Amino acid sequence: MSEVLTVDAVLFGLLVFSGIIGNIMVIYVVFDCAKLCASRHLPPSDTILVHLCLANLLTSVFRTVPIFVSDLGLQVWLTAGWCRVFMLLWVWWRAVGCWVTLALSAFHCATLRRQHVSMGPLGHSRERRRVWVVLAVVWAANLLFSLPALVYTTQVRGNATVELMVISCTTRPLLGCVWEFPTFQQGYAFASSSLALNEVLPLVLMVGTNLATLQALGKHIRTVRAGGSTGAELDRHVSSERKAGHVIMALVALFVGCWVLQVAAVTYYNHNRGAHAEGLLTVAHFSASLFVGFSPLVVALGHGKLRRRISGILQSCMHRLKQTQDKPAEITEKDGRTTQSAMK
C-alpha cells in the first residue's frame, strides 16, 4: 500500500469511526434524556433526530466500513443474492437520510411559523403521532423506490468497469456488487430519477426551508419581544430559538455541501468521464462520509441538553480512566511501604 493511500485510508477511517461513535452517542443520550422526563416520551424533534442518526449509523456500519476495509487491501465478495439485499439497503438508508434531514429542517420551520402551539398531553401526543406518521411514510416510500435493486444488481469478481453509477448506493463496486440493467437507457432513466427524487429535490427543498426558517425565526423573535415576557425569560427564549435554528441550518448546510460534491462527481462520470472523473470521485468518496462523520458533532455542540449530557458522560469516563491509572500507583506505593516495614 502506498504512503498516499495509507494517509487517505487513515483520514477516511477517522471519519468513518467518528461517525459511528457519534451517532451511537447521540442516540443513547436522546433516549437517556427521555427517561429523565416526566412524560418519558421523545420530543418530536428528538424523534426525527434519532431516525437521522439511525439511518447514518446503518449506512456507516454496512456500507462505509466495508469501503474502509477494501481501502486497506482486504477484498470481500458477496454472492449475487446478498449483493441484491445489500444494494437495496444501501439505496434505502441513503435516501432515508436525505429525507429525514429535510424533515428535521421542515419541522423546525413549521414550529416557528405555527400560530397556535399544541399544549397539554393530548396536544403533544397528537404532534408525536403526526411526526411518526411522516417518518413511517419516509421509510416506506424509500423502501419501495429501492426495490429495483433486488432485480438489477449482480455480482462480479476482480476488476470491473462501472458503466453507470447510481448515486444512492456507492461510487464504485463494493463487495463485488454492481448495477446491471438490460439496456443503458433503462439504467440511465433509473439513475436520473434517483438523482432527481433522492438528491436534487431534497437539496432544493432544504435550501428553501432554511430560507423560510430564517424569515420565521426573525419574525418569531420580534413577536416574542413585543409581548409581555420578562427580560430574563425573553433572553432565554430568544437564545433557545436561535440556537435551535443555527443547529438545524448548520446541519443542512453541511448536508448540502457534502451531497452537492457527490452529485456533481457522479453526474460528471455518467455524462462525461473525462480526465477529472477519478479526482472528482475521490472527493465524492470523502464527502459522502463527511456528513455522516460530522453531523453528530454539529448536533451535540448545538443541542443544549445533548451537549450537557455528553459532556457529563465524557467527564465521567475521564474520571474513571484517571482512577484506573491511579490504582496501580497506589498499590505500588503500598507494597513499598510494606517492604520497608518488614525490613525494619
Curated annotation (Swiss-Prot):
GO MF annotations in UniProt: G protein-coupled receptor activity
Topology Extracellular: residue spans: 1-10, 69-84, 152-186, 268-279
Keywords: Cell membrane, Disulfide bond, G-protein coupled receptor, Glycoprotein, Membrane, Olfaction, Receptor, Sensory transduction, Transducer, Transmembrane, Transmembrane helix
Cysteines joined through disulfide linkages: C83-C169
GO BP of this protein: sensory perception of smell
SUPFAM superfamilies tied to this protein: Family A G protein-coupled receptor-like
Glycosylation sites: N159
Lipid bilayer topology: Multi-pass membrane protein
Record InterPro entries: GPCR_Rhodpsn, GPCR_Rhodpsn_7TM
Pfam families to which the protein is assigned, alphabetical: 7tm_1
Annotated tissue distribution: Highly expressed in the olfactory rosette. Specifically localizes to crypt neurons in the olfactory neuroepithelium. Colocalizes with the inhibitory G-protein gnaia in crypt neurons. Not detected in other tissues tested.
Compartment(s) of residence: Cell membrane
Coiled coil feature spans: none
Compositional bias ranges of the Basic and acidic residues kind: 324-337
Highest taxon listed in the record's lineage: Eukaryota
Segments on the Cytoplasmic side according to the record's topology features: 32-47, 106-130, 208-246, 301-344
Annotated GO CC locations: plasma membrane
Purpose: Probable olfactory receptor.
Protein name as it appears in the record: Olfactory receptor class A-like protein 4
Organism: Danio rerio (Zebrafish)
Lineage of the species this protein comes from: Eukaryota, Metazoa, Chordata, Craniata, Vertebrata
